[in-house]
């Protein structure tokens, strides 16, 4: 860490420690506080000209207090936050949190995580590198990507580049006080192509922890143009049941639905088709899904969760069997289970491939639909019913034949997960979910007729 960042972290730790001491004196039974600070730079270009240049610099402090009710058995909770960090604003925020807690109904599951579960192991995770690029650097990158995309038949809607860095400090009245750091860089191009009055749009993007690790501007622009050009002349296919291959970036959404279904809030609200499914076979026996909070440079690498609980590497799915939920301390108490270190979400979820590259999956599918985009919100997590608008390509003999749009793919997530045929080695690592493409034996497709 450079001296500037060290100084910022020490200042933030001092603020959090002072808040915790103050609310303790004010009579809070337990308390937690979180300070976060971030800065970023983003630019966009259009038609070879700079469109926007934006700089953000944000700070915030959130305070949560827990008060004992009259019989001392249950706790009530009050939270308040502020973006103004002078002593008067912080004092007012404490007042608000205390007042809200005094008015809130007590809950036997409220309170801090058990002290024994708080993190004591802090690994170097490679999640932060100082961002030294200037606005001119990002503008040059965006213009170069735009120029690479603006080839015959393709126009560029927008080219963009962004960098950011942030840190946060979390502390609670159990004596826990720790920080975490993050930096991000991303670049994207959105392109358009037209044929016979029909406009098609596609894009490509990349995201890393450090701008120097991004795909080159030229590659991003060329990929956006190629994908857009491929979509020209799209048509519908006849309704029916077909083999379906979800391209890796779209397959991530299927992993996302699984993660939602095993999250604590969905489970204790009886809003998940995977409630009471621990130990049940959900996927084929060849499938393993891991969670690795210690992945170096991972987008969701964490030594501790939002409750301060120690994270751990584990299997969510092992040999097709559901072996873990995603539980905060509160959710665990509601469900009568143990917390898993997932307050705030999952950490670097990795689906282990069992098949070859993308072209191998096309050959394995032989004839069917390749889905490259889904849209709409047709997912019912209570029942697992799935229905989304989609576009992509028709495939025959393992070869892409023509683009397809204005179709709907449907099924039930229970059946889809259980019937998964293959996961490709074409792993997309541009987010906290890492997976290759997913192949299904058949899905219901609504198109023409």
Predicted regions and their residues:
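Active-site bordering "gate/hinge" segments
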Residues: 1-302, 306-309, 318-321, 399, ...
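Dual-mode signal for accessory low-complexity, basic/Gly-rich regions
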Residues: 210, 261, 275-449
């Amino acid at each position: 860490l450079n001296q500037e960042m060290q100084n910022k972290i020490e200042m933030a730790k001092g603020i959090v420690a002072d808040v915790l001491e103050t609310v303790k004196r004010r009579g809070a039974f337990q308390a937690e506080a979180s300070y976060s600070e971030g800065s970023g730079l983003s630019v966009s270009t259009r038609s070879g000209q700079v469109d926007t240049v934006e700089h953000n610099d944000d700070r915030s402090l959130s305070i949560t207090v827990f008060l004992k009710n009259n019989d001392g058995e249950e706790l009530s909770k009050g939270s308040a936050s502020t973006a103004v960090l002078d002593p008067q604003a912080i004092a007012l925020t404490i007042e608000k949190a205390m007042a809200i807690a005094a008015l809130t109904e007590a809950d036997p599951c409220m309170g801090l995580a058990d002290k024994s579960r708080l993190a004591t192991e802090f690994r170097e995770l490679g999640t932060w590198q100082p961002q030294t690029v200037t606005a001119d650097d990002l503008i040059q990158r965006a213009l170069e990507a735009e120029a690479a995309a603006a080839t015959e038949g393709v126009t560029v809607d927008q080219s963009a580049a962004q960098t950011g860095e942030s840190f946060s400090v979390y502390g609670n009245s159990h004596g826990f006080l720790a920080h975490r750091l993050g930096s991000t860089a991303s670049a994207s191009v959105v392109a358009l192509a037209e044929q016979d009055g029909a406009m098609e749009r596609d894009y490509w993007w990349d995201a890393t922890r450090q701008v120097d690790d991004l795909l080159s501007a030229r590659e991003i622009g060329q990929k956006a143009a190629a994908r857009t050009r491929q979509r020209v002349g799209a048509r519908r296919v006849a309704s029916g049941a077909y083999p379906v291959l979800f391209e890796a970036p779209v397959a991530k959404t299927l992993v996302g639905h699984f993660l939602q279904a095993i999250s604590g809030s969905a489970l204790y609200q009886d809003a998940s088709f995977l409630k009471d499914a621990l130990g049940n076979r959900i996927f084929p026996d060849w499938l393993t899904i891991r969670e690795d909070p210690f992945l170096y440079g991972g987008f969701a690498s964490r030594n501790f969760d939002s409750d301060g609980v120690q994270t751990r590497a584990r299997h969510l799915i092992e040999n097709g069997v559901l072996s873990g939920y995603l539980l905060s301390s509160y959710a665990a108490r509601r469900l009568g289970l143990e917390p898993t270190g997932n307050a705030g979400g999952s950490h670097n979820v990795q689906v282990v491939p069992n098949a070859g590259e993308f072209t191998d999956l096309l050959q394995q599918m032989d004839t069917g639909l390749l889905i490259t985009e889904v849209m709409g919100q047709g997912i019912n997590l209570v029942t697992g019913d799935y229905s989304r608008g989609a576009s992509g390509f028709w495939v025959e003999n393992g070869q892409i034949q023509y683009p397809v749009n204005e179709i709907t793919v449907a099924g039930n997530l229970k059946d889809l997960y259980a019937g998964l045929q293959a996961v490709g080695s074409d792993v997309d690592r541009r987010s906290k979910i890492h997976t290759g493409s997913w192949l299904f034996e058949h899905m219901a497709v609504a198109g023409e007729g």
